[in-house]
Amino acid sequence: EGGIEVTNEIKKVMIETEIELFSDYDCDPFYSDRPIPFTETELGEVKTISAPHMIITLLHNMELLEEQEVIIIGSKGGYLAALVAQLIGEKGIVRVLDTCANVISHSKQRLTHWPTIEFRELESIEVSPVAFPGEFDRVLITGHIEELPNWITSRISDTGFVIAPLGPENNQHLMKIERQ
């Protein structure tokens, strides 16, 4: 109803991927289009899986194709990576980066049987991971960021782009950034 197209492919993977596999918290709010927690960090910060309408918006805007390489910065419990992995197929690859070791551990445990999903802990969003391969087809940043770091913008492929909520914490806009 909100105007975002839900393709048959997106609908199928969302129906077939049980949210309960990615969170030990009550998942009922998710079915009412609300975000749900999936873990709490050592510092007491609650990490969430986005509401379904936001996940659909992100997936729609990613323009995913089979065999793509997709980088997701911000784990969202592994749920988003599972959806993306299904949409890009077994010849694609999903690389999940997160700055929180607890979040990476949680997501890895939930996705042990997914051979096309890799995980890596980031020192900081500002610092490129060591020995990180090539140019980027698709980059999805799931948490707000004021501006894209150079290690990302300089490696967007000719046909690639980044989807990210850019701007200050209280005033972000979901943006699509292509190679300049």
Where is each model-derived feature located?
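Class I SAM-dependent transferase core
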Residues: 1-87, 102-106, 111-113
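Conserved nucleotide-cofactor-binding alpha/beta core module
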Residues: 59, 63-180
